[in-house]
Amino acid sequence: MEFPFGSVGTTNFRRFTPESLAEIEKQIAAHRAAKKGRPKQRGQKDKSEKPRPQLDLKACNQLPRFYGELPAELVGEPLEDLDPFYSTHRTFIVLDKSRTISRFSATWALWLFSPFNLIRRTAIKVSVHSWFSIFITVTILVNCVCMTRTDLPEKLEYAFTVVYTFEALIKILARGFCLNEFTYLRDPWNWLDFSVITLAYVGAAIDLRGISGLRTFRVLRALKTVSVIPGLKVIVGALIHSVRKLADVTILTVFCLSVFALVGLQLFKGNLKNKCIKNGTDPHKADNLSSEMAGDIFIKPGTTDPLLCGNGSDAGHCPNDYVCRKTSDNPDFNYTSFDSFAWAFLSLFRLMTQDSWERLYQQTLRASGKMYMVFFVLVIFLGSFYLVNLILAVVTMAYEEQSQATIAEIEAKEKKFKEALEVLQKEQEVLAALGIDTTSLYSHNGSPLAPKNANERRPRVKSRMSEGSTDDNRSLQSDPYNQRRMSFLGLSSGRRRASHSSVFHFRAPSQDVSFPDGILDDGVFHGDQESRRSSILLGRGAGQAGPLPRSPLPQSPNPGPRRGEEGQRGVPTGELATGAPEGPALDAAGQKNFLSADYLNEPFRAQRAMSVVSIMTSVIEELEESKLKCPPCLISLAQKYLIWECCPKWKKFKMVLFELVTDPFAELTITLCIVVNTVFMAMEHYPMTDAFDAMLQAGNIVFTVFFTMEMAFKIIAFDPYYYFQKKWNIFDCVIVTVSLLELSTSKKGSLSVLRTFRLLRVFKLAKSWPTLNMLIKIIGNSVGALGNLTFILAIIVFIFALVGKQLLSENYGCRRDGISVWNGERLRWHMCDFFHSFLVVFRILCGEWIENMWVCMEVSQDYICLTLFLTVMVLGNLVVLNLFIALLLNSFSADNLTAPEDDGEVNNLQVALARIQVFGHRASRAITSYIRSHCRLRWPKVETQLGMKPPLTSCKAENHIATDAVNAAVGNLAKPALGGPKENHGDFITDPNVWVSVPIAEGESDLDELEEDVEHASQSSWQEESPKGQQELLQQVQKCEDHQAARSPPSGMSSEDLAPYLGERWQREESPRVPAEGVDDTSSSEGSTVDCPDPEEILRKIPELAEELDEPDDCFPEGCTRRCPCCKVNTSKFPWATGWQVRKTCYRIVEHSWFESFIIFMILLSSGALAFEDNYLEEKPRVKSVLEYTDRVFTFIFVFEMLLKWVAYGFKKYFTNAWCWLDFLIVNISLTSLIAKILEYSDVASIKALRTLRALRPLRALSRFEGMRVVVDALVGAIPSIMNVLLVCLIFWLIFSIMGVNLFAGKFSRCVDTRSNPFSVVNSTFVTNKSDCYNQNNTGHFFWVNVKVNFDNVAMGYLALLQVATFKGWMDIMYAAVDSRDINSQPNWEESLYMYLYFVVFIIFGGFFTLNLFVGVIIDNFNQQKKKLGGQDIFMTEEQKKYYNAMKKLGSKKPQKPIPRPLNKYQGFVFDIVTRQAFDIIIMALICLNMITMMVETDNQSEEKTKVLGRINQFFVAVFTGECVMKMFALRQYYFTNGWNVFDFIVVILSISSLLFSAILSSLESYFSPTLLRVIRLARIGRILRLIRAAKGIRTLLFALMMSLPALFNIGLLLFLVMFIYSIFGMASFANVIDEAGIDDMFNFKTFGNSMLCLFQITTSAGWDGLLSPILNTGPPYCDPNRPNSNGSKGNCGSPAVGILFFTTYIIISFLIVVNMYIAVILENFNVATEESTEPLSEDDFDMFYETWEKFDPEATQFIAFSALSDFADTLSGPLRIPKPNQNILIQMDLPLVPGDKIHCLDILFAFTKNVLGESGELDSLKTNMEEKFMATNLSKASYEPIATTLRCKQEDISATIIQKAYRNYMLQRSLMLSNPLHVPRAEEDGVSLPREGYVTFMANDNGGLPDKSETASATSFPPSYDSVTRGLSDRANISTSSSMQNEDEVTAKEGKSPGPQ
């Protein structure tokens, strides 16, 4: 048996010597000779794969253990390369102490140093030494820290340069400079080092003080950290990979932004200069007015910005005494405008990244008009959502590809390891057969490969054995580490693996939840060492382990660490396989491969086997040791002092405590205490009474004492040695210690910092809350996987912060105290010092870059700021943050959120709750029976209540007993027939010997842990069964009846009634879905009871019976008729028969489609009527009265509809439908408000509130519109997981909120001066605190106010955090926090500067992680639902799916007749021109030129420029018109058969009309709005869209968008509905709010239109803080509660509670749900589109095939001659092309020929497709599929039966040639014989006339010329002599044709291309 990894032992490592080099040279020479010897055959694909380097022997990887132990003397020495790939390369390897591989070139370095030179060897040794890289890394880090300081001496710089130079020299000496592979400059990372050093010397030589640009290059040194740390290189690789992939998206983004920017330029140029100017201002002066000259310009109240306005009817208007005029500058320092293409592009980029876009939106709408909202809707939905998410999709895909590669690498390693294990296993068996004790391997220290600490290990093993603990938790199966190890070794593991814990997931396998501490002490287990070893070696999974030892408590007095916490209560944790062999019996495979004992008779082999086993043992131990955290000496010390075994009484005391702390009720109590403690902490607020404060303090002390006691008890019960091996316990211990510290410290000072630690206790809930646990794990895993990425992000932030500081710090006017003052104003965001620079960069990463950039551009040069900010934005925000999201999404997997982790642990909390419930039910039963026996009441029997099943008709949904442990326990108490004795039932949860049974579907049973039932208590598993035919259906129904026969009298239909109707066609009908859950006698998990289809459903599917069944159901549910027999009526007798007829009539009315349409129409009308009830309704009495009447009419109609449905459907059916309930509630609201109005109670507050609920009316449309209903159903499916994540987010945020309350409660108040606009904060030198503010208030203008959004209590804290997480309004909160001093003190500028960090940490963990978890959850959930639907899209209706599939297939293709060339010679000439490719290219170039000329346009351009541009435009219109006319002239009626031509035609018509209109309108400018002119000019932009035709990558992305459209339309519809309802609510609640912040005369809730404007803006969560701000006003100085309003109400204050609820719910619904659904759809369709585009053959390739075909087959006969095939194959492009010479490839394709040597189109396409895709099963299905499609769309192919094939013809050809040659040779021999004078001819015998020619002539004829036509089968067709060929083409002789084909191909190549088709 050969060991798979080469020879074993130190022979693997051979020094690199001159002999080794000579051997390599020999190999290289041999390789070259071999290469020359075999010239590559032309026309043949080189199938042989090139050899590749081994993955695990790559440079920078660690050498795997199985290459043996590296002797110390070979560390750092040149060794021969182990990778066979490099046997022909001049290389050698060097290994350092940690076995890391470094590969070097064996050529001379710098032409001076050979590989054996002493200097070079020393350099090599130094360069691979670990201390060298540590020294360099430390130097780089110190250098980075120094760079953040400005006051350090220049000499320090030189020191660093010297170190870097030394490093470079060492590397160059060791590797060589650049010529050969593995030299210094061949590694791109070294380019970075080299450039840094070069620049340092350039800087030293020239004085660089003036050139700050070059100085900033020093910053790149931070990147050197990447090159030093190997893990980072991989991530950078992924980043670069994703940037490459972004090329197409970047092009598409730039293209779309350019188009939108051009539209913006045409529509809005110059508009943002419109401002309100005082009446009477001189017009010439107005033109030069800028915002600085504030005297004449109206300033918007509450801001410092001028009020913009427009002259359109729906634009913003000026106040009285002001008029709207165009001035000289734009808003925001003149940077926000559409005046030129560049500024418009910047504005559009800002819109795409959604930074402060609401400001641009409001400015533009105010200046241009509300109708332009359409432009913003398009840009936000197409530009922002679509493009940004495409970037996410691309990055995600790039990351996944990288991950797949990594996985493949791991799998390759795993495979090798398995092979090694098999070898080891066999050798082990042989050793055992020879009687060698395998445990003696541990003492096999003579071998150089012996495990390092085998002798240390032995005593530990013995000491453990002597402990004699038989704790079942130590068994191999239950230890998570071992499971992981076994799975790594490829063995089966005990517990079923949850689907997401795959070994090869995208992250390192995380530790098992149930055992967070990984392994017990050092990974070697109690019990028999040898059996454990053998079980690993024999590959026997834990499932075969046989029964495990059980004991209620360990025999040893030490209770062990896990006993009682996870594995207690005697529940089996291993999955016990039936019939598993007990003991170390060999499996069959093992016996089969058993090696003979003779094999090891020779001493050498025995020795070798020992050595192999020893190596493999060391590999296994290496795995174990990787888990060893402590050195062995410390472990023995810990075992001695930290396991407390004293006198028996102490042990007894320990036992008692042990029982106490492991009881489920103890766990429940602790959990309750954590919850109550959290509530206590959350109750802190400001202002707080002393008594309340004292109560909280007392509570804190009580809880601290309680948790301290818990910790003490656990330490005593478990012993410290075991207690501290659980991570949760360590966590507990830290928190308790900190709490005690906090109690001991004084009340003031660092109190709040310590307090925050107490909050972490909330995380203990994760032990009993699976979702929280899972999300913490996801964040943990992501942070783990993201460790490197986070580091890269940190480096990026660091570098950009430093660059910013170096380049810009001087421009910000920095003072000594670090405050930046510019134009007399203090700046918060500047780059004066590193901390502020870091904050600016961090803010850009949060997506807020534009405002910082404006300030930067004001203080510095524009280009530096633009470059810096946009680079950070694109690199940091778009790429790195998206990579983060990609990793987060990958951390999710299938059933993470739906099912809690299957970790085999009985959840103590659930056990405790189950016990309580069981006890409660027992108590209630006892009380019931007591009352019954005493009062002698005849109550219905409990048995019937609990056990009775409804009759068969409703069997569909109710025939299952829930898995829920408690329900099962309780529900079965009253069913003695189902289980054992009654008294045992309550205990079945905790007692494995008690089972409860339920009928189980045949063939379904599984053996699983009982824990899963309790674990999945609240889960439901859905199971579908599809009966395979009539028999099964009947059987199922029969079973359903039997199932209930014992319990209920049969009613409804039975299977006998069904039998006659179930014909053949119902055989494959699927039964409806049934929630299948149950507990049975063989399974305590997921057993499914019998699935019963509803017979009525089956019958409804039979058309003949559908009519009869079309009757109303019973009116009342079963329960009513059972309790009140009067409800049960006989419909065949007189009074009820009439009623029955009425019901049937109502039923037919309600079911009629016209009725439904009428109701939908009414719903739409009534919803529309609500939109008119706005703030100005009182001013329109006529409209008001109409609305009142219509409201009554609608209410009556809806009430009538409801009554009709009650009569038709009956109460049971009506009230069991969720949509009907919705209708019922909404109708009741309308009815109540109507009655209140009639009774004149409509002014009562509660009735007013109820009236606002009429806004819910549109919700009724949901159930009627299929598109929306589909989306809502998908959403409802996702609600459980969304709520789960929402809850977990709230817990996360609770911690930050309580922390915020501790840090900032009461500190946000300030003294403001109300005279300024906006209110200014009074200087803290003038007013220091609250009392000062009141004392100084002589003028009455000073107010002591609080910031509206603050941290005074936890609820407000949540609101503040929501604003921070959505980055809206967060600046004000941060400024207040940073300026805060103390409670009731006046804030001071940046007093607590480092409070910024609180927000930074929250944004990373609270904002970034939790909000992206939503994306993850939603996408994940929709994928789940998709799987359930069998991969169909869940957001589309059936109709839309048809569109989607049509888009995907793009119709079945067929050869089209090409447009015939016109006969007229002039037309023919033009036809030749327009069908040339060059013509298309020229037109494309002109379109690009046109685009460029449109970009040149600006606002305020000179008259001359306008004229020139006008002429150029006219020229382009003429050109495109000319093109259009030419094409129409040449192509005639065929012009309009092409969609693009139609598009061109429309664009040309629009362009001409826009020219005419602009001429007309310019003369009538006073009558028309110039806006109309602008819209018409947009037609020109349509021309640009023609460019899309040319770009394939962009087409794919747009194709993805087209495929997304139906689903996006549905989601958009739902979003519109939500906006509609909220805008009605907004009008009812906030119409009278004061104009302030985001609310003004245009953006408000006064009318429906304005409300929609506001709601569209906050759909992306933009500016919601501004809309909320005025609603939070409750009184002076902000608003006046007594001010009368126009609609009769009083006050302009808001209602904070309603406002907060309104905005937070809207943001959660729209932003988190709807927008994320949008993302989910785009990601999905992008994947589909790219899959289709990355397939080897796409639709485009087939199109191209047909286009080429048209040229060769102008008559569309579908056949071409075989002679033309070679040219056809060469003319094709893309993957289908077969370049010349291609004859033999085509012949080998074996194409069928029809008479006339013709080949059919489809046969060629199949053959070429096969040539690209290779042989595969899918090809056959594709072939039949294509054939069917083709037959459907084309004339029948059957008329042409093939008579031969190309291969057959070639074989016949060659056969003929061979026969001819043989005959000639024969004749030649004859002639030679005859010319021989000695030969006597015997002509009469031969009977053949002899040739007269001589020998030479004959030879010339045979070899020189080739007269025989059959030998040149290149361009001419075969001779038409095939009629004689029979059709049996199967008997093809395999004549070797390759040589003749090769000759022929060479001939063909020489002859050149043969002519194509005529």
Swiss-Prot record:
Residues 549-560 have a biased composition (Pro residues). II repeats lie at residues 646-910. III repeats lie at residues 1141-1450. The keyword Lipid biosynthesis does not apply. GO terms for molecular function: voltage-gated sodium channel activity. IV repeats lie at residues 1459-1758. Residues 32-42 have a biased composition (Basic residues). The modification Phosphoserine is found at residues 440, 443, 466, 478, 611, 614, 1452. Ubiquitinated by NEDD4L; which promotes its endocytosis. It comes from the Eukaryota. Residues 1017-1038, 1933-1942 have a biased composition (Polar residues). One of its GO terms (biological process) is cardiac conduction. Belongs to the sodium channel (TC 1.A.1.10) family. Nav1.8/SCN10A subfamily. The channel consists of an ion conducting pore forming alpha-subunit regulated by one or more associated auxiliary subunits SCN1B, SCN2B and SCN3B; electrophysiological properties may vary depending on the type of the associated beta subunits. Found in a number of complexes with PRX, DYNLT1 and PDZD2. Interacts with proteins such as FSTL1, PRX, DYNLT1, PDZD2, S100A10 and many others. Interacts with NEDD4 and NEDD4L. This is Sodium channel protein type 10 subunit alpha. The lineage of its organism: Eukaryota, Metazoa, Chordata, Craniata, Vertebrata.
